[in-house]
Each structure stands twice: as structure tokens, then as C-alpha cells.
């Protein structure tokens, strides 16, 4: 019986269950960080650009990175992505789509981090320039991207492909046009 085998598997782990059986189960498993990486596309002078930051913290200080942060205890991954985008650009109510989950064991040399990547399409004329400068971020033409840290090149490529597919069937590109249109 499938249920009995699961029950015996749990009890065979010799866990001591106190008042809260789930507490012991969860405490016997590893914990790790859940990160958010935002691939922020913008339209600039007829070209698609990507908002990157030059890291001023370890690991990989001084290298190019996507904008990112960590999921907090009180938020969903979608809410965390919106918060990260807002904290770094000042923008709200921006079209964002989940790109995927990136979880290679050694993807971040600092700690074990599983990252959920999102792409955003923004009007390059509407972000908070002072906030972006504060985070040491720069717009870089997609055809001139510098080497990126960790698995960020893979995230960018996957986001680019998703954006192309979506743009061929939906009018998502309107997010990049100035309000004049």
C-alpha cells in the first residue's frame, strides 16, 4: 500500500516528532536561499537594451550582474520580483513574466541559492534614474553585453527567447513605447 510505505519511510528516518510533526520533518531537511533575478529589457534608440549592475558586493564584486534580491518570508516569488523591480527602478505595475527556475548546486559561490528569474519590459524613459545610479546600474545594448556572472547569461538567453515568442502572438512590445503612442 502506497500510504503505508510513505508512513514507514518517514518513521524509518528515526525522527522524533514532538507536538508539531511537521516541525521535525522540515528541520531534518536542508535550507537554502530563494533568489529573484530580473532581466529588465528596455527600448533605446531603436535597440533593445538590458539593465545590468556592476556589483559592489561579494561574491563577484566588480562584475556584471542582473538585478536581483532574495524572497522574504512574507512574500510570494511574484511579489518578491515586483519588489526587487520597484526597489531598483522605482517602477510599479510593469509587465513581468517568469522565465524559469535556476538551481544548479554551484550556481552561486556564496551560498546555496535557487533563483527564479523574471523578465520585465519597461519604457526606458520612465524609470527612476537616481535610484538606478544608486545601485550602480547601466543600460547595455543587447548586442554589446559584457560577460555576466554565474548563470545569468543562460537566464538572459531564455528570457530573450520567451520575449520573442510572446511578441509574435501578443502586443507586449507596447510596454516599451513612449506614452506618445
Where are each of the predicted segments found?
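Intrinsic-disorder-associated, low-complexity terminal segments enriched in Asp/Asn/His/Tyr and depleted
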Residues: 1-4, 13
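Short Pro/Gly-enriched beta-strand edge/turn motifs at strand-loop
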Residues: 17-23
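N-terminal strand-loop-strand
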Residues: 23-65
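A structural signal for short, well-ordered beta-strand segments
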Residues: 36-38, 98, 118-120
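Conserved Nudix-box catalytic region and its N-terminal flanking loop in Nudix hydrolases
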Residues: 47-91, 170-181
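A short coil-to-beta-strand element that immediately follows conserved catalytic motifs
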Residues: 92-100
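Active-site-adjacent beta-strand/loop module that shapes the phosphate/pyrophosphate-binding cleft
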Residues: 106-127, 159
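NUDIX/MutT-family hydrolases
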Residues: 119, 128-162
